[in-house]
Amino acid sequence: MSVAPDGDARTPAGVRRTLPTTLYFDVVTIGSRSFLRETYDLVIAGASFAGLLAAREAARLGASVLVIDAQAIGSGQTSACATTLGALQALGMTGTVQQVHREMVIHLEPASGRQNDPLTFRLPYPFATFDYGQLCRNLAADGVAVGVEFARARVTGYDASEVVTDRGRVRGKLTIDAAGWRAPLATSIAPAHVRRDHLSCGLEAEVPQPLRSPASGLHFWAGHGTIWPGYAWAFPAGAVTRLGVLAFPETGGPVSANGSSKSGTMGTVNGASVGLRTALDRFMDGPGADFWSPDGGPPWRRSDTAPTTGRHLHGGFIPCSPRQPVVGEVICVGDAAGHCFGLTAEGIRAAMTFAVRAGQLAGGVGSGRWSASDARAMYWRFATMRRPYFTLLNWLQRWLATLGDTGIRLYSEAARPGPIFWFLMSQYRWAADPVPLLRIPA
C-alpha cells in the first residue's frame, strides 16, 4: 500500500474497504426490549474514531459489540484530521493518507503587525493528514468483518446498567461513552462531568490547494496579531488544504481576531462560534491566503467577498482538560474523557490510543478473562498514568494565554533547538501512542 510522499498533492492509492448497504440494522423489539440482543459484551455510544476503533479491537478478541450513533458513518467531521503517520500505519489505514508532513512551521503574528521569519521545526517522526470519512468507513468495515453490529439511534443517557436511546434500551457487560465532548452517558450519571468553561472552540474550512504551488508542513499562526488566546492553522492535505482558527477558553471575555478585547467579537468559548467565522475570514483573507485557492488555480487574492461565503464549514468544541476516565459503570474515551492535548488541541491520536486499550479490555470481558469491574479498574489505571501529561499541557495553555508577543516569541524560540524539540516531541508521543498497544497481545 503506498503512502503520499512529502508535499505530494495526490491522494494515495490504497485499499478501499466497502461498507455493506445495510450497515445499520433496523431497531427491532424483542419482547419489551429493542435491538437485536438483550445484552452485548460491549455497547458503545458514538461511531467516530474512538468508538469505531474500540469496537474493532473488542470484536477481534471475540466480544459481541454494538455501536450506536444517530449519524451516518463518516459524517459529522469536526477534526483537522492530522496525526502521526506511524499511528495510521499501525491501524492499517495508510490508504486514507492524503499528505505526509515532516516539518512544523510557526508563524508569529504580533499585534504590531511586524512580520517575523517563520520558525521551522524538523519533526522527529512524520505526521500525516488523512481523509476523515474514509478512515471512519474503513474502521467500520473492519468492524463489520469481525461481527460488530451498528444501530442508528440517539443516545440519551445511562440508567440501571442500560444505555438509553430514543429507540429503546440495551445492556452491555461493559459500556463505553465515545459520543464526543457532550458525553451523554457520563453526564447522565455525573452532570458535572463536562466543564463548559474548559472547552476550546474551533472552526475550519476545507478548500482547494493552489496545485501549481502546493504547500507542505503543518503550519500554525500565533500571537496577538491573530486570534489570541488560540491560534490559526493550515494543514495541506493533497488536493485540498484545511484552514482553521481555534479559541482557547482562557479569553476571560470577548476577544477579536486581532487580539483586541474591544474591537471585535471573538467571545469566550460559550459564545466563540459567533466570532470564529469572522476570525476565519480574516485569516483566510490575510496570513493564510497563499495556502488556498478558490478553484485550485492561483492562490486567493483579497476581494469584496468573504472567503467563507457559500462554503461548508465544520468544527466544534474541544475538551483540552482531562476528565474522569470512568464514571460509574461507564468508560469514557476520546473527547468524552477530555482526551485532547492542551496547547495543540490534538485529540485524534489520544482517542485512538485510549480506544485501543478500552477495546482490548472489553475483549477480555467477552472471553471471560476478567470481569467488567476489573476491566474498568485496568482502564482507570491506564488513563491515570497518562493524566499528568494532559494536565501539564493544559497548564501550559493557560500560562501561554497570559503572555505578550515577546513572551510568545521567546517561548517558541526556546523550544526550537533540535535536541530540546526532539525531547519534547518524544514525550508528546509517549503520552498517547497506539502503536505499542497494537504490537502486544491484550
Where are these regions (language model features)?
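N-terminal FAD cofactor-binding segment of flavoenzymes
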Residues: 71-105
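Glycine-rich Rossmann-fold phosphate-binding loop(s) that bind the pyrophosphate
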Residues: 46-48
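C-terminal helical "tail/cap" subdomain of flavin- and related membrane-associated enzymes
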Residues: 21, 360-442
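Predominantly flavin-linked oxidoreductase catalytic cores and closely associated redox partners
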Residues: 142-299
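Glycine-rich FAD pyrophosphate-binding loop
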Residues: 59-77
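N-terminal Rossmann-fold NAD(P) dinucleotide-binding loop
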Residues: 51
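Extreme N-terminal leader/targeting segments of oxidoreductases
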Residues: 1-40
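FAD/FMN-dependent oxidoreductases across multiple families
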Residues: 249-362, 366-370
